[in-house]
């Protein structure tokens, strides 16, 4: 299971990659593998203000649908429109082209409350 060390993670299997004053968000390799083949992604609305832990998007697979939660509070500033036509990018490249949304955090310091790669690995091991 791939867990890049350049980003933060949540116990609900989202990743958060700081880029300047924004954070790119997607789901982990573990999450996409557990979901199976992704067939649809319900993207959040740009401009929406969200709280940490709020359900902001939905990823639907052939097996189930799963809410995607905001890792930190802030404003959605961009969504990955490529997922409307090619939702399988979430499976093919969960840490790259399969990102889901970008948000501008209310406080970048909130990222420090998230897990690093090692902490996320421990979460996966405890769930196994």
UniProtKB/Swiss-Prot annotation:
InterPro entries: 2-oxoA_DH_lipoyl-BS, Biotin_lipoyl, GCV_H, GCV_H/Fam206, GCV_H_sub, Single_hybrid_motif
Modified residues (N6-lipoyllysine): 63
Gene Ontology CC: one annotated term: cytoplasm
The keyword Thylakoid is annotated on this UniProt entry: no
Domain Lipoyl-binding positions: 22-104
CDD domains: GCS_H
Keyword terms: Lipoyl
A Pfam family annotated for this UniProt entry: GCV_H
Keyword Transferase: no
Cofactors named for this entry: (R)-lipoate
GO annotation terms (biological process): glycine decarboxylation via glycine cleavage system
Cofactor note: Binds 1 lipoyl cofactor covalently.
Transmembrane segments: none
Its job: The glycine cleavage system catalyzes the degradation of glycine. The H protein shuttles the methylamine group of glycine from the P protein to the T protein.
Quaternary structure and interacting proteins, as annotated: The glycine cleavage system is composed of four proteins: P, T, L and H. Monomer.
Assigned protein family: Belongs to the GcvH family.
Protein name, as recorded: Glycine cleavage system H protein
Organism: Thermus thermophilus (strain ATCC 27634 / DSM 579 / HB8)
